């Protein structure tokens, strides 16, 4: 993950930066992922209220946000450009980090345990990693397929 993080930082130094939050780690991850989404004509909306510093490990933040936003981008790409959207809501409250990622998708039922990626070695690792991060922070994660919308909600506890 360290190599990936340095690559992201390098890309952002050469490109446009948006300030989503004063938390440098989260802001760096979001800039990287949202620039990719915007290049793919995906409308992005955010509502983020997190402190400048918190004890969420940067590699955990990268795995959690990276996998969820990559999955949302991948689902949106299967739709015509005008129907592509994703939203991220993050709220820090009373030592909890509450996160919701929603995105448009085709109407096909999603099986989160089954990857559509061609690389079978990494199949299902993304959602498994998200579950592991939630468990590490004594939290929960839920995946909801609502037809043309997919939503992931995660709550992490003990975040200071």
Residue ranges and their predicted role:
Residues 95-125:
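Glycine-rich/acidic phosphate-handling loop/turn and adjacent ATP-lid/helix
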Residues 6-10, 22-39:
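Short beta-to-alpha transition helix within the HATPase_c
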Residues 18, 44-64:
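Conserved short strand/loop->alpha-helix "switch" segment adjacent to the catalytic nucleotide/phosphoryl-transfer site
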Residues 126-130:
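Short alpha-helical Gxxx[C/S/T] motif in the catalytic ATP-binding
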Residues 37, 73-81:
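A short, flexible helix-to-loop-to-beta junction within the catalytic ATP-binding CA
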Residues 83-95:
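Short beta-strand/loop element within the Bergerat-fold HATPase_c
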Residues 138-151:
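Glycine-rich ATP-binding loops of the HATPase_c
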């Amino acid at each position: 993950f360290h190599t990936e993080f340095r690559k992201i930082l390098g890309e952002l130094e050469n490109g446009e930066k948006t300030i989503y939050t004063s938390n440098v780690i989260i802001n760096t991850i979001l800039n990287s992922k949202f620039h990719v989404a915007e290049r793919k004509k995906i409308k992005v909306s955010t509502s983020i209220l997190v402190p400048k510093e918190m004890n969420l490990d940067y590699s955990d933040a990268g795995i959690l946000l990276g996998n969820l936003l990559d999955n949302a981008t991948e689902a949106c790409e299967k739709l015509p450009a005008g129907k592509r959207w994703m939203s991220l809501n993050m709220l820090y409250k009373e030592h909890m980090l509450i996160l919701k990622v929603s995105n448009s998708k085709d109407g096909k039922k999603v099986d989160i345990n089954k990857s559509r990626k061609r690389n079978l070695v990494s199949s299902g690792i993304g959602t498994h990693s998200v579950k592991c991060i939630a468990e590490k922070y004594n939290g929960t994660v839920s995946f909801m397929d609502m037809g043309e919308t997919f939503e992931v909600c995660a709550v992490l506890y003990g975040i200071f």
